[in-house]
Structure formats: C-alpha cells, structure tokens
Amino acid sequence: MIQDSEFFRMEGVPITKEEIRAVSIGKLNLDPEDIVLDIGCGSGGMSVEIAKRSKFVYSIDNSEDAKNTTSINLKKFKIENCEVFHGDAKDLISKFDFNKVFIGGTQNIEQTLEILKEKKIEKVVANTIVLENSVKIITKFEELGYNVDFVNLSVSYGKKISSGHIMLSKNPITIITATLK
C-alpha cells in the first residue's frame, strides 16, 4: 500500500486511509483481468491501488476538485490503466463495461445500486462513515438480492508524547461487501 503522505492532497477532497484501502482491496478480491468502477473517487487513493492490481479502472466523482486530484495522483504514480470522469455515477454507469465496483461516495446511492443490479455486477465494496448511509446501503443490497457482509474498522495511529506514547484514532469506517447470489 502507498502511504497516505505520498498522495497529492487538495483541501476538502477526502482520501481513503491506507489501512482502510488495504482491507477494501482485500474485500474486492481483485484479479488482473478485472475492470473496476470506482464511484466517488475523491483523491484517487483507491483508484491508484485498484489500478495496480487490475486491468482497468473507471473513476467517477461529482466534484471537479476530486476529479482533478485523482488525475494528479494517477500521473504521480504512473498509472495509465485508469480514466477519470466528472459527474453523477447514476448517469455515467451505463457508458462503461466493468465487473467489480468500489463505492466511496454515496450521492444517489439507492439508484446507483439498482443500476448495478441491472448490470448484474457480482461484487461491490462500499465504504461509509455515516451510519445512516451504512444502513441504507445494507438494506438496499439485501432488497436487491445480494449477500451482504459488513465490518466496522477503527484505526488508531501512535504518537510520541513527553510521557510516553498515545494512540490517536480516526473515524470508524464501515466496509460493506455485497456479492450477487
């Protein structure tokens, strides 16, 4: 995994933290022939890591800043098997052929999941920080007939202080894995 500090960052554009990327990549169970859609690509952390392990990645974000940040990181890490698009995933999904999906953004999520089901996408991994979004995604996947697994991860980083060491925690992330039955 590439360390978070190596990525170009832009104010207000999120990045999936290194440890969360590692687990999410594991849940995707990537194959070198996979073509992956990254919805809500943010700073491109997942796009870069997925592209290193798959045939091609389509990255989408509704933020122009996120699109630009992802593009910068793709160039920085010499990733050539990824294309970035600005727009709403539900409007762009039909333009691409892919077999796996990573979701880091939840705008219009229920409509997006319905479209993924129509395309018979067998493996989707979604990361959420907002509890209500986790419940919404889990419920929708179950309604659509997916097998759903989810885990909540809390990552803490060590920091040296004058009297010893402390652990500083980041926000917990729910990683949802949906597999078509």
UniProtKB/Swiss-Prot annotation:
<feature type="binding site">
    <location>
        <position position="89"/>
    </location>
    <ligand>
        <name>S-adenosyl-L-methionine</name>
    </ligand>
</feature>
<dbReference type="InterPro" id="IPR023475">
    <property type="entry name" value="CbiT"/>
</dbReference>
<dbReference type="InterPro" id="IPR050714">
    <property type="entry name" value="Cobalamin_biosynth_MTase"/>
</dbReference>
<protein>
    <recommendedName>
        <fullName>Probable cobalt-precorrin-6B C(15)-methyltransferase (decarboxylating)</fullName>
        <ecNumber>2.1.1.196</ecNumber>
    </recommendedName>
</protein>
<dbReference type="GO" id="GO:0043776">
    <property type="term" value="F:cobalt-precorrin-6B C5-methyltransferase activity"/>
</dbReference>
<keyword id="KW-0489">Methyltransferase</keyword>
<comment type="pathway">
    <text>Cofactor biosynthesis; adenosylcobalamin biosynthesis; cob(II)yrinate a,c-diamide from sirohydrochlorin (anaerobic route): step 8/10.</text>
</comment>
<dbReference type="Pfam" id="PF13847">
    <property type="entry name" value="Methyltransf_31"/>
</dbReference>
<feature type="binding site">
    <location>
        <position position="16"/>
    </location>
    <ligand>
        <name>S-adenosyl-L-methionine</name>
    </ligand>
</feature>
<feature type="binding site">
    <location>
        <begin position="40"/>
        <end position="44"/>
    </location>
    <ligand>
        <name>S-adenosyl-L-methionine</name>
    </ligand>
</feature>
<comment type="similarity">
    <text>Belongs to the methyltransferase superfamily. Archaeal-type CbiT family.</text>
</comment>
<dbReference type="InterPro" id="IPR029063">
    <property type="entry name" value="SAM-dependent_MTases_sf"/>
</dbReference>
<keyword id="KW-0808">Transferase</keyword>
<feature type="binding site">
    <location>
        <position position="61"/>
    </location>
    <ligand>
        <name>S-adenosyl-L-methionine</name>
    </ligand>
</feature>
<keyword id="KW-0169">Cobalamin biosynthesis</keyword>
<dbReference type="InterPro" id="IPR025714">
    <property type="entry name" value="Methyltranfer_dom"/>
</dbReference>
<dbReference type="GO" id="GO:0019251">
    <property type="term" value="P:anaerobic cobalamin biosynthetic process"/>
</dbReference>
<dbReference type="GO" id="GO:0008276">
    <property type="term" value="F:protein methyltransferase activity"/>
</dbReference>
<dbReference type="InterPro" id="IPR014008">
    <property type="entry name" value="Cbl_synth_MTase_CbiT"/>
</dbReference>
<keyword id="KW-0949">S-adenosyl-L-methionine</keyword>
<dbReference type="GO" id="GO:0032259">
    <property type="term" value="P:methylation"/>
</dbReference>
